[in-house]
């Protein structure tokens, strides 16, 4: 099978991050089983233009490493981890996971995508906080 064009892969990963952020937010807030969240998302949303492998890597990888991920960015915060907005916390976890585990993705892409998600889902100035 021929590799996908770069712009197609980028768009599919963008959707994977979008759904991944929503699914991880749901996990954070409701504590539902990851398998249930994944099944719900795959039933309720069109995954035909989503990088499913990337979505699954985020959905299962972030919770598996949540303590290590938070330990990596917590010293850099200007407030306690418990005081972070849940969207900000989710995006920082995801971004840290991508920076550590997805070395195939340029760090600038990880930051740009996290900021874009913060603008879409976060509080008024969340994107500034995510951008550092």
Locations of the language-model features?
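N-terminal interaction/assembly modules
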Residues: 1-132
